[in-house]
C-alpha cells in the first residue's frame, strides 16, 4: 500500500461508477449557511457518508423555494445518487420531478407520523408544546414569540402551532400571545424583541424559534437595561453551543443534531443501494432548563 501511495496512485473512480451505475455522490440542500443551526447535523451527515464511500455536495437555498427548486434540478442533472432536503414542504412540480427521476430523497429536521415521505427528524410541534408548558409552569401568562417566516417553512409553522395550541389549552385569551415573524439572524431577533418590549403590555416571557434569534433578544435586553430573567424570560430552540456560553445561559429545546445527521446518512445510503424503500425515524428532543427562564416579575 505504501508503494501505491509513493507512486501517487489514485483509484479509478470512473470504473467504480460504471460498475455500480452510481456516482457515489449525495446532494444536500440546506436553508442557510449563515448560522450554526444546520452545521452540526450536516457535519455528522458528511462523516457518515465518507465512511460509506460517498461524497457530499452541499447547496444553500437561502430559504427561497425557487432557489431550492433550481438546486434540486442541478443536483439531479449532475447525477447525484440521492438527496437530503430540509422539511417536507415544497411545490408539486419539484415533488413530481423527484418522483419522475426516481431519485432517493430523504427529509430531515422534521418528523410527522402522517407524512409518507421518508424522514429522520423530530416533531417540531411536540417539542414546542413541551417548552411552552415549562414557560407556563413558571407562571407566565403574557408570551411573545419571535419566529422565522412560517410561509413555506413547515418547521417554523409547526412550532408556532404547538405554542398556540398549548396556550389555548391553558385557557389563555388570544391577546396573551404576540408573534413577530422575521429573518433567522441575531440582529433580527434583537429588533423583534425590542419592538415587543416597548409595547404597552410587554410580554413577561419571549420565546424564540431558534437559539440565534434568542441570542439577539438577550443582547438587546442588555442594551435596553433589562434583566434576564428578572424583567423578562427568554427561551430558544436547538441547544446550539452558543446557548450554553451566553450570559445568562439559554433555556432551550435540545435537538440531537449529530445523531440526526448520522442516521439520515445511513438511511439515505440504504435507499440509494436499494436496501431500503425509505423509512422514517423520530428522534427525541428534550427541554434544557438554564438561567434565562424564571418566574415573571411581580
Regions found by a protein language model. Name each.
Residues 13, 21-133, 137, 198:
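Alpha-helical recognition/docking segments in bacterial nutrient-uptake
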